[in-house]
Regions:
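Surface-exposed beta-loop interaction hotspot
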Residues: 56-60, 66, 73-101, 111
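Extracytoplasmic/lumenal domain signature
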Residues: 76-81, 128, 167-199
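Eukaryotic intrinsically disordered, low-complexity regulatory linkers and tails enriched in Ser/Thr/Pro
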Residues: 9-16, 22, 42-45
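Beta-propeller blade signature
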Residues: 1-11, 57-76, 120-124, 167-175
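Short beta-strand elements that form the blades of beta-propeller/WD-repeat-like
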Residues: 1-5, 32-61, 101-116, 120-122, ...
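Short helix-loop boundary/capping segments
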Residues: 117-130, 135-138
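Repeated scaffold domains used in trafficking and secretory/extracellular systems
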Residues: 17-38, 83-107, 137-152, 186-216
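Exposed regions on extracellular, virion, or secretory-pathway luminal proteins
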Residues: 129, 141, 161-162, 174-176
Length: 216
């Protein structure tokens, strides 16, 4: 069963339940962000092609398509909308191209987001028409990258594992090439850690509200 609850002030020990819907095999969100307009919450989600995949049957649990879960909190109803491209084909997902733990922003009717894996998409939350935009490698043997987004593009903070030099890149949603904004080694001493702490990892970062310097 899928449930939407309200975590603000409530009466008693149990938060109010806003919506309930039956669990659908193979449907997962894996998100901590969503589009919200009025009483309607919309969340890009993953629908597995093989919900019963296991090592025993040889089916791949990572193969599936993108859908939108749309929750109308005024009625408590959920609608599942397949996400399709301009030709009407499904937006396919797999181990190499994911939407898991995305950072997203709504611009008009379009929800733009990039997954923790570095795959960027845009989806019209009204029609369900979507498009794959680009990918930015998020992790390799010698670096790791975390993302933030603005209305104009993606900010990627890369931590180089060997010397812990940190670089901020920017790439517009419209597909222009990625460009470097700045590089610093000032965090190196902290990230390398100590005998007590071990090495540190950058889990996330924030953009100053209203700042969109990469677009300038």
């Amino acid at each position: 069963m899928a449930v939407v609850v309200q975590l603000t002030d409530h009466d008693g020990d149990v938060p109010p339940v806003l919506a309930v819907a039956p669990m659908i095999d193979g449907l997962t969100s894996g998100q901590n962000m969503f589009s919200c307009e009025g009483d309607v919450v919309t969340m890009p989600s993953f629908q597995a092609t093989y919900p019963n995949a296991s090592r025993d049957n040889g089916l791949d649990a990572n193969v599936g398509t993108m859908v939108l879960q749309r929750w109308d909190l005024s009625t408590g109803q959920r609608t599942i909308i397949p996400v399709v491209d301009a030709e009407g084909g499904a937006i396919e997902l797999n181990e190499e191209r994911t939407i898991h733990l995305y950072e997203g922003i709504q611009v008009g009717n379009e929800y733009r987001f990039i997954s923790a894996n570095g795959d960027a998409f845009a989806v019209d939350v009204t029609s369900g028409q979507g498009r794959y935009l680009f990918s930015i490698p998020s992790r390799s043997r010698d670096h790791s990258t975390v993302f933030q987004v603005s209305a104009t593009g993606v900010y990627a903070l890369e931590d180089r594992g060997d010397d812990r030099v940190v670089t901020l890149f920017y790439r517009p949603w419209d597909g222009e090439e990625q460009r470097e904004l700045f590089t610093t080694s000032d965090l190196g001493r902290y990230l390398k850690g100590t005998a007590l702490t071990g090495q540190m990892d950058i889990q996330s970062f924030a953009l100053r509200p209203g700042w969109d310097g990469g677009a300038q």
